[in-house]
Amino acid sequence: ADGRLLVKAPKGWRQYTFRGGGESVAVQIDLPTGSRVHGNGGMAGLRSTGRLGECRFKTGLGEIRLDEAGPVELKTGMGDIAVGRAVDHADLSTGSGALTVDRIDGTGVIKNSNGDSLIGEVTGDLRVNAANGRISVDRADAAVTARTANGDIRLGEVAHGAVVAETGFGKLDLAIRDGVPAWLDLTTGCGSVHSDLDDAERPQPGEDAVEVRGRSGFGEIRIRRAPHHVRATSAGATP
């Protein structure tokens, strides 16, 4: 009624065990393009094809895969999250699993306790926090904060604003867009620091500039110019 569809599944005791023979419910729904989807479950997954509007989904155990939606708020205690395109804002969290987003047209907040976090292109401010796993961002057009306790951090192209990259154990590979001046503040507890950037004059008011703060407790740091051809082609691309 009122343009809403509510789906509920019975909570049988067998569905909460990891042993075979448990009960399960599979639901397939055809929705108009741009529909809103809200849901939660103890053990449930979500797979969407096509374009959704606002999508909020939370599960204790299960994978979440969307082609396109926005804004999105997705959380799983254990399982992968994969999004083709997020619009407006993306708030994504997994306790254990791979987290990939091809493109965020807007801002993003990413949390991953155990697993890699791989982002293609993001147009707004981005924050990524991880406990165990590498962080990779192909291209960022605004500020980036990327922190992991254990894992490498790769930023394929940054172009504007404050960039913070911190890892307790791992390498930093940060590339600045060609022609954009950058201020560098780089420290590693054990390892080398390399910068391929030439000295540049102070930018004029209103001119794009990047302020980079890089920290590694154990690992090398490399700063370079991004190749002209860099574009977000795959969130899973390795450096």
Explain the meaning of each model-derived region:
Residues 1-239:
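Intrinsically disordered, low-complexity terminal regions
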